[in-house]
Amino acid sequence: MTITIPACAEGTLRAVLLSPTHGFLAESYYEDARRDFTSLSYVTKVNGWGSFSGAVALATSPLAEHMDPNNILVIYRTPPGGAAEYIDFAGIVRRTERFVTSTDIELVQIYGREADSIINRYFIEPTAGSVNNSKTGLADDVVKGYVRDECLLDPTKVYPNFFVASDLGESATTLSRDIRYEHLAGVIKNIRDAADDFDFKITILDDLSAFQFATYEHYGLDRRIGSASPLIFSLDNRNMQMPRYWRRGYDGITRILILGGGQGLDRTVVTVENAAAEALWGFHEQTYDDREEDTPNLTSVGEGVLLERGPTSGLDFEIISANYGVEWKVGYKVSAEYAGVEADYEIEQVRVVVNSEQLESPIEAITPDLRLLELRD
């Protein structure tokens, strides 16, 4: 789903560079993406992390001399129509290049990742005197506990100006985990996917003084059908094009054997089936190897695999109304209607690409990725 609009035609973008300790270095306003960036792209995600790249002219941009590895790039957006400015993206520069183009313009190019990638740099170690790092509680609080253990307790591993939000119990799912030398980011994603009732995100504070890891019942606004202010994509609302409703029937999986831990006769096997689908479309069985998963969670794993691989249906479409930053942002939950079908989605990711090089009118392409939450057909 891609929306192409004139870059910042009615609003503005603002870029700010900070030092690794969040000290101010430089900023740049631009109304048409041509004053500083010859190119700029960034991806912002919820429950993960995006990336960014950008290039500026060395001779004219106030940002050029500060484009160093480990500095922080913050992108502000003021949407059209007088809406308030907000932080659309914050990331950490990981690589820089300085070069001369074929047209003899000297540029500085930066590449980096969204701030959420901080959690991708840690492993969960056993607690002192224990075989594992074991936690039990609400899923979102367990996640924050692991982040505190790895990112805050050891002064040699602490990231400057980083903290974890308080435990507020955004999740309603209680679970236990025994972790030993596992990737922190992977554990966080696994817990989040198992619970599927909270979001996580690392954001930069409004005063730019620090990054914060937090969990949310909904990171963005809930604008699904039935909410106080629903956002519905439909042909009647003229904000949808090329809708496609599809159904997959007989070739879907109706029964899944989840192979858990153990060997031989001692191996745990859990069967999950869709009896209604078997009656309609016939029996279709497969196995799924997940020996690393705890036995109590094998059923939920099977339900997830069955949902993904089983008889199913979907509604795909393209958004044609811009309104990014006004009607919707990353993390928002929205709905769609077509052919008597209703569907709910989470906007998992937004990709923004501003290309001004050799263009009289710079173009901003905005591409949201939607995750289907529920289909009612």
Predicted regions and their residues:
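Short, low-complexity Ser/Thr-rich regulatory SLiMs
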Residues: 44, 97-100, 202-206, 354
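A mature extracytoplasmic/lumenal domain signature
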Residues: 58, 114-116, 204, 262, ...
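Oligomerization/assembly interface segments of phage tail-like spikes and tubes
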Residues: 41-61, 105-118, 191, 258, ...
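Beta-strand-rich assembly/attachment modules of structural machines
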Residues: 1-139
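Acidic, small/polar-enriched beta strand-loop surface segments
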Residues: 2-14, 22, 189, 193, ...
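Short structured motifs
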Residues: 37-40, 157-158, 331
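Charged- and aromatic-enriched interaction segments used to assemble
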Residues: 106-107, 111-248
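Short intrinsically disordered coil segments
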Residues: 68-71, 125-132, 231-237, 273-275, ...
